[in-house]
């Protein structure tokens, strides 16, 4: 497993997360990583074949683990990152250094985030989404004291550009997307980070965490 500080730095510096079924990841994820994915959220749908899923995960760790953070949606699989989706009550971590993320449903989860979580996924299909507005205002993306969060949805490059213009700096693609689209999205976000007035200070902070 990766050491704690490295995991923390990697989630702070992540721009693009992609969500896809774990069983499809062996075929699809290598291309998505080349396209710019920093985090892969691998879903099991709650009906895990633990032996099969563990083998897939270990193979992915072996070949891609230094290039992408691998997140799972279940405590049954040991990974460096775990995401709690709505309705999940079990907050156990896959191992003591693992990062825990939360897919939020209410503004209060953004305004006063639970200290158990190291990052958030904020659903919102448009820049005017109340949850996204709350996230930009209460957790400015490139600030040291903010909880890192991803705008989550089935975005294309055009919608990501619109989100960036309202202050979004990380996206979570719930439908995976094509490699070509991912490359465009990654470039939009890279440019937004470079042009953000908080970027230099945030970068210095993040790499030391």
Language-model segments: residues:
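Active-site mouth loops of central-metabolism enzymes
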Residues: 10-27, 99-106, 149-155
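Short, well-ordered coil/turn segments that N-cap beta-strands
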Residues: 11-16, 36-39, 64-68, 79-80, ...
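N-terminal active-site wall of soluble small-molecule enzyme domains
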Residues: 37-95
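Histidine/lysine/aspartate-rich catalytic loop segments that bind and position anionic ligands
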Residues: 96-134
